[in-house]
């Protein structure tokens, strides 16, 4: 999170294509100081398209062909923005995004590939092979339906290029192993041209046609698709065919928004020179299928994108530092390896073709080597040790786990309690409660109450807009926990070293993030303070009004109440793993999305029923439940099986990964009642995991559960019944954990 060199330039990578993935890897090995690197991609992972037929055929699991952009971005020190670019304002140097404010850049590179589909055909009726995520999910669901006997094993693949032929054979192979009646399988390959693989060498066409025939794939050439209605595909000839699953690898086309940018285009693709720079705009580079190499036109193939990666890396650095650019010289021909459904492949180069199982093994080795290059990242460098003689304990602290962001960066509960032990109680009559609860309660007018709280922490995400939203959501949690309605907020912003222009654009993103969350909560951002420091740190002071309701808080739980939870637990562990490059990208994306979910509706549903309520933050689930119990003088039992867990958190806890504050929060474990087997359960450790923008815990009467469960379900919200309070008061409340 620290920026040791002042940020002077913004480099924006649009799309997580193969060339950009290579740039990220190389940038992590040798970054350019002073450059803030940003990657924008809709998904946390990008597919390696060369292994797609193997996934469809069942040879690979999905993880095997996903390039984890979250891990690569962390390794490169880049911020990853999970969104879609919809336009470029090249005059201002701004990228326009689908769901957030513009991102400014000094230099931009575009590697977004191509889409597939047929004009006039509803996307919901035919599955494009790209993007991979939706296609893979739909295909796996279809295979399960075939196995269950609820759908017929009939498939149509639209597009007779190399990708379509490979896909048809892969589907035939997969269904052959999944369907008990092989004679029921019907795979049809539909091509508008008069021949398959029209641009391929005759030897390759012959081998692929032989593979199709061997697998029983029916081929229709000269058959343009006119329409799709239900499970029926209508051809321009008037003929129709039935298919329960329709895939399209035809109609490859560039992103429509490129046509609105003013860039020099060739049939919709960005025209670039030999250095991969736009012919019309020197601040724009393009690679992969997005680009048209004006001097050396080549077919759309992944091999060129992979080989462009190192040249692009060099040229981006050169353009940002005043160096000399290198030309990219593509080979005139290349080895084509195509799978034949099963574990066999065909190879073609210079018009010669050969096939067999050995070539599938060769293809697999090449593919696996490429994926290993992007996934086997070097260990992240440890912070530099202090030189010379140091005080006692310094070396041990330097060797400890790096400090987490969010609530993982907070002071531990024991140190905080000790520091506040001598704090005097409020002296003013209008300050009704002070420390000890989620928010202070102040008198407001003659009869109302105002609740007041603040939160700030070091950033765990390099995306200022998302980090600001999460910070605001977290700060508002104290207002929601009291049952209040947010009123106003003041911001505290610490920026790392950067030029004035970068300060302006970064603060604009932060303010937009604060505003997006606060406005949705019904509150106003009314001011704040900024300063420069070592790293990005954000905070908010927030007020809320009770509007005539009694403030909720830690006190008030009653014997026999049940404990309910409104969000899964485990984001602290996932984000700690992300900092170390150990979390899967989809886990990180799920955690970020979880932290962006507001507790507004949950608070409104709970506050009329709850006897006590708090939000889960830095002390973890166990620590905050213990706070409720101590205030009510009641014991309770928690059931690990009833708690919702953040995706990936259990796997990471099992691997021994924890937040940096875990040694402090887990000291409470000694006071809990639990069997040895429960303590050995990785979920037990997650009870002490700090939560940023965590959910609410409420003590509610058992008779309110049915109505609450229905109300939460009606609003699409989760509600977990995680425990029950004892029926009798206790001077030494204990928390018992079961599983």
What annotation goes with each model-predicted range?
Residues 268-285, 329, 345-346, 351, ...:
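FAD-binding beta-loop-beta segment adjacent to the flavin cofactor pocket
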Residues 389-739:
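Helix-biased detector of long, well-ordered alpha-helical tracts
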Residues 342-395:
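C-terminal auxiliary extensions adjacent to catalytic cores
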Residues 2-9, 77-156, 247:
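FAD-binding core/adjacent interface of flavoenzyme oxidoreductases
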């Amino acid at each position: 999170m620290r920026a040791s060199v002042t940020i002077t330039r913004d480099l924006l990578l649009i799309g997580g294509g193969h060339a950009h993935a290579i740039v990220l890897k190389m940038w992590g090995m040798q970054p350019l100081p002073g450059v803030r690197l940003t990657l924008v991609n809709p998904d946390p992972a990008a597919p390696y398209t060369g292994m797609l037929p193997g996934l469809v055929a069942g040879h690979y699991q999905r993880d095997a062909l996903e390039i984890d952009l979250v891990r690569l971005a962390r390794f490169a020190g880049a911020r990853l923005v999970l969104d879609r670019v919809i336009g470029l304002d090249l005059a201002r140097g701004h990228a326009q995004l689908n769901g957030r404010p513009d991102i400014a850049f000094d230099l931009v590179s575009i590697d977004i590939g191509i889409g597939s589909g047929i004009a006039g055909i509803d996307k919901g009726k035919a599955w494009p092979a790209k993007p991979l995520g939706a296609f893979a999910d739909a295909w796996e669901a279809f295979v399960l339906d075939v196995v269950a006997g609820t759908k017929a094993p009939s498939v149509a693949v639209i597009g007779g290029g190399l990708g379509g032929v490979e896909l048809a054979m892969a589907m035939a192979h997969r269904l052959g192993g999944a369907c008990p009646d092989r004679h029921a399988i019907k795979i049809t390959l539909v091509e508008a041209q008069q021949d398959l693989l029209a641009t391929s060498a005759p030897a390759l066409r012959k081998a692929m046609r032989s593979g199709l025939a061997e697998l029983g794939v029916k081929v229709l050439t000269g058959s343009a698709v006119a329409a799709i209605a239900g499970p029926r595909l209508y051809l321009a000839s008037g003929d129709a065919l039935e298919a329960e699953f329709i895939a399209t690898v035809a109609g490859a086309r560039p992103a429509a928004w490129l046509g609105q940018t003013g860039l020099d285009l060739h049939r919709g693709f960005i025209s670039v020179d030999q250095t991969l720079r736009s012919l019309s705009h020197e601040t724009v580079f393009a690679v992969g299928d997005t680009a048209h190499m004006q001097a050396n036109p080549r077919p759309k193939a992944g091999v060129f994108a992979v080989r462009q990666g190192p040249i692009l890396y060099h040229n981006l650095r050169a353009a940002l530092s005043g160096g000399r650019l290198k030309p990219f010289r593509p080979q005139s021909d290349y080895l084509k390896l195509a799978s034949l459904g099963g574990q066999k492949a065909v190879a073609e180069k210079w018009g010669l073709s050969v096939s067999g199982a050995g070539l599938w093994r060769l293809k697999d080795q090449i593919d696996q080597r490429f994926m290993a290059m992007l996934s086997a990242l070097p260990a992240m460098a440890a912070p530099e040790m202090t030189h010379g003689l140091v005080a006692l304990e310094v070396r041990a602290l330097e060797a400890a786990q790096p400090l987490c962001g969010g609530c993982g960066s907070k002071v531990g509960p024991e140190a905080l309690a000790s520091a506040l032990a001598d704090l005097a109680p409020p002296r003013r009559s209008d300050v009704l409660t002070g420390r000890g609860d989620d928010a202070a309660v102040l008198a407001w007018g003659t009869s109302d109450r105002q609740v007041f709280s603040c939160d700030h922490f070091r950033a765990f995400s390099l995306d200022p807009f998302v980090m600001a939203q999460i910070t605001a959501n977290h700060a508002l949690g104290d207002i929601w926990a009291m049952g209040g309605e947010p009123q106003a907020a003041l911001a505290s912003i610490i920026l790392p070293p950067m030029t004035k222009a970068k300060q302006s654009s970064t603060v604009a993103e932060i303010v937009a993030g604060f505003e997006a969350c606060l406005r949705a909560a019904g509150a106003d951002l009314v001011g704040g303070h900024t300063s420069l420091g070592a790293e990005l740190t954000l905070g908010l002071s927030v007020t809320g009004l009770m509007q005539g309701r009694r403030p909720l808080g830690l006190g008030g739980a009653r014997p026999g109440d049940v404990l309910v939870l409104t969000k899964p637990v485990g984001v602290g562990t996932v984000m700690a793993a992300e900092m170390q490059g150990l979390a899967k990208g989809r886990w990180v994306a799920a955690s970020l999305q979880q932290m962006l979910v507001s507790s507004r509706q949950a608070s409104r549903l709970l506050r009329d029923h709850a006897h006590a309520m708090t939000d889960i933050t830095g002390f973890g689930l166990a620590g905050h439940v213990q706070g409720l119990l101590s205030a009510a003088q009641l014991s309770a039992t928690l059931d690990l099986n009833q708690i919702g867990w953040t995706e990936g958190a259990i796997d990471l806890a099992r691997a021994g990964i924890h937040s940096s504050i875990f040694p402090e929060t887990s000291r409470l474990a000694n006071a809990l009642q639990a069997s040895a087997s429960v303590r050995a359960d990785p979920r037990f450790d997650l009870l002490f995991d700090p939560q940023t923008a965590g959910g609410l815990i409420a003590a509610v009467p058992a008779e309110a559960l049915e109505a609450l469960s229905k109300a939460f379900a009606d609003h699409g919200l989760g509600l977990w019944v995680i425990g029950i309070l004892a029926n009798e008061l206790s001077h030494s409340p204990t928390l018992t954990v079961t599983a």
